[in-house]
């Protein structure tokens, strides 16, 4: 006898496949297809979709899910009129930039440009709301937030190096919204709204360079090494900002503890990024209208220098709309912009440059070790890896060996 599954049951099956293969990025896009899904932190400290009830479900939820889920597929976006850089993606223009408001520049992760643009979009009426992320009531964790004022934009400034599912906020699909989201979220949202633009659902998407989502447990462990117990109530916790690159800082009222970015990200948080992020083809936000990144100063070897200073961003317009917004904001005195070459950004972003350059090799090693990856289209990954075949072979072998060792250790 053939059993007919409901749409929500079919969606659940597809979600289980992605989660069981460790390919979920925790973006929350699936919750927009079915109101009975919630994003919850699992035992490893990552956000995953969980069925809480049978809610309102899109009539083509399962089909749509297979088109938008970053754990299933990601495609390179090439907007009309854009140029193409092999590792930084498609773009129309690129600038060195920072917020002209000194408080926003100081509070933001690099130059404060996304915070400044968010506030200006609201104050100028170009957006009715900006959906992003901010600290939860317990600032050890992060939550989606709908921002409607300059003060709220400033309160949400700075990176949050802990899981948050920005797309679990339904406001992302309201007309006249802007959304500040991770690259995987930008990809899912761009794919989701593509057929909805005639209905007026076409959010301005702002993103940022992303090296991956660390486990929330890494934050707890880092705090413990700094003497902050899990039971200690925190008033504030910021990962970056308040300078550039800014220090990981926690405050419980009477006491403040902090550690530098190189140690917080490099030693404690970064090593815990989830598997899906390790095979990400798009840490540079190709599906967004506007993307910000750190425009690092580098040493003689080309590695970023993390000494404190005034924040400086690279600001990329990937679409005509994004370029228009950036130029209007500059004319309005919101941000400073100086035209720059994309090669100069690639030179100071070694992680993004190397990850994309050898991702095909990493994927090959992963598949040979029996670990599947999503389908990636349009990034030219094979061609990039073939430019340096010996190093690509080394990356493949290393990936294969690490996966096999991890599997044997867990048996």
Region spans (language model):
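Extended interfacial segments that mediate partner engagement and assembly in macromolecular machines
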Residues: 88-108, 112-115
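Intrinsically disordered, low-complexity linker/loop segments enriched in Gly/Pro
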Residues: 148-203, 209-215
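Long, compositionally biased charged/polar accessory segments in the mid-to-C-terminal portions
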Residues: 127-128, 231-411
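Local cysteine-cluster metal-coordination motifs and their immediate loop/turn environment
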Residues: 21-36, 64-74, 182-188, 272-285
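Portal/gating segments that form or line small-molecule/metal binding sites
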Residues: 108, 113-173
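Iron-sulfur cluster-binding cysteine motifs and their immediate structural context
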Residues: 3-7, 25, 29-50, 62-85, ...
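Short, charged low-complexity linear segments at domain edges
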Residues: 1-13, 29-53, 156-160, 243-262
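Short, flexible loop segments at boundaries between secondary-structure elements
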Residues: 201-224, 322, 347
């Amino acid at each position: 006898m053939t059993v007919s599954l409901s749409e929500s049951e079919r969606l659940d099956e597809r979600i289980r496949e992605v989660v069981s293969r460790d390919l979920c990025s925790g973006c929350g896009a699936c919750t927009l297809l079915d109101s009975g899904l919630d994003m919850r932190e699992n035992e490893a400290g990552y956000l995953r979709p969980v069925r809480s009830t049978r809610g309102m479900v899109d009539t083509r939820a399962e089909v749509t899910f297979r088109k938008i889920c970053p754990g299933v597929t990601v495609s390179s976006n090439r907007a009309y009129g854009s140029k193409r850089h092999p590792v930084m993606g498609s773009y129309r223009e690129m600038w060195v930039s920072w917020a002209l408001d000194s408080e926003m520049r100081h509070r933001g992760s690099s130059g404060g440009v996304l915070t400044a643009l968010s506030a200006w979009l609201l104050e100028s009426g170009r957006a009715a709301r900006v959906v992003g992320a901010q600290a939860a009531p317990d600032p050890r964790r992060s939550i989606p937030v709908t921002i409607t004022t300059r003060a709220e934009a400033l309160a949400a400034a700075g990176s949050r190096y802990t899981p948050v599912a920005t797309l679990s906020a339904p406001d992302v699909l309201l007309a006249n919204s802007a959304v500040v989201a991770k690259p995987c979220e930008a990809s899912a949202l761009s794919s989701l709204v593509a057929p909805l633009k005639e209905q007026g659902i076409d959010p301005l998407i702002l993103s940022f360079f992303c090296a991956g989502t660390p486990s929330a447990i890494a934050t707890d462990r880092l705090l413990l090494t700094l003497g902050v117990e899990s039971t200690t109530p925190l008033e504030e916790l910021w990962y970056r900002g308040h300078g550039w690159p800014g220090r990981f800082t926690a405050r419980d009222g009477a006491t403040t503890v902090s550690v530098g970015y190189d140690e917080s990200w490099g030693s404690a948080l970064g090593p815990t990024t989830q598997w899906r992020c390790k095979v990400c083809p798009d840490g540079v936000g190709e599906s967004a209208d506007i993307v910000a990144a750190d425009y690092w100063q580098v040493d003689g070897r080309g590695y970023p220098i993390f000494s404190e200073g005034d924040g400086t961003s690279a600001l990329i317009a990937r679409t005509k709309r994004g370029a228009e917004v950036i130029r209007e904001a500059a004319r309005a005195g919101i941000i400073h912009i100086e035209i720059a070459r994309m090669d100069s950004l690639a030179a100071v972003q070694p992680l993004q440059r190397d990850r994309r350059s050898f991702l095909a090799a990493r994927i090959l090693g992963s598949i040979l070790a029996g670990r599947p990856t999503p389908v990636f289209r349009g990034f030219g990954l094979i061609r990039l890896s073939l430019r340096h075949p010996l190093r690509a072979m080394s990356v493949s072998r290393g990936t294969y060996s690490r996966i096999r060792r991890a599997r044997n250790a867990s048996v």
